[in-house]
A protein has these predicted regions:
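Short, well-ordered loop/turn sites that connect or cap secondary structure elements
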Residues: 40-41, 60
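Short, structured beta-strand/loop micro-motifs enriched in basic residues and often containing a Trp
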Residues: 43-51
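Ferredoxin-like alpha/beta domains used as RNA- or RNAP-binding modules
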Residues: 1-27, 47, 55-77
Length: 77
């Protein structure tokens, strides 16, 4: 049984050791643009590791799981 409820996350590789939440949403194709990321984050629709996250600049690292709607993506290096 998975420790994170919800959909199985897709691994999304990043180039650096960390990435900002807004950038990752776009990279993982969870949103179309950075402009679209801002309101969904502000509205509390995004979860990081199961917790609501409202900071677009939140730094994510390998292993973090981001969910939006029915989709999930895991930060991978």
């Amino acid at each position: 049984m998975s420790s994170t409820p919800g959909p199985d996350p897709v691994d999304v590789p990043i180039r650096d050791e960390s990435i900002r939440l807004g950038q990752f949403l776009k990279l993982a194709n969870l949103v179309e643009s950075g402009a679209e990321a801002k309101p969904v984050i502000a509205d509390g629709a995004v979860r990081v590791n199961g917790e609501v996250e409202t900071r677009r600049g939140r730094q994510l690292a390998a292993g973090d799981v981001v969910t939006l709607g029915g989709l999930a993506a895991r930060v991978a290096t």
